[in-house]
Amino acid sequence: GPVDFLNRRTLLHDLRELVQPLNVSTRQVRAAMAAAEEAQRAFYAGLQAMGAEFLSSLDRWDRVAVLVGRPYNTCDPGVSMALPYKLRALGVVPLPMDCLPLEEIDVSDRFDNMYWRSGQAILAAGRFIAREPRLQAIYVTNFGCGPDSFLLSFFRRIMSSTDGSPKVYLELELDDHTADAGVNTRCEAFFDSLAAQGTWARA
């Protein structure tokens, strides 16, 4: 059957069911879970360290765009239509939002009922980007995505800088029918508009 990650108890039960034909003990399953959790924690800690080092080296006019969205949208080259490579070709550094210190950013003052962990991370990324003049945001979504239908409006509201002025961002809705040329054109137009406002270095 399916493996439910709702909580540790449910996960342990489902994993035991899954490996039952392999004659694996409960103790071995617990040990495997602990090892997996530690590997995941170390992976995210590495991303955070890499992000902190990168941000500390940034110049005011470095061209950096944070890819905002769920990992299966932003990190998969097929789903994202190789967006990071397109940005590099335009002279822009793509930065995964997981490299930002999201755990340190509290959004409960405006969205205390956002129980969805991925939604919390996306809004935390928005708040960080809004207050960081060296970063721009590209929100990657899909056609007909239910959660994004309301999350995008929250993201738009939280994308305001410390002085209250809104910070623009690019929203890319990608699916199998999206043309490569269209993605390139929208990115170029976004970066050109930022340069015209004087908030972005020209290529």
Question: What residue ranges belong to the model's regions?
Answer:
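An N-terminal assembly and electron-transfer interface module characteristic of large anaerobic redox
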Residues: 1-203
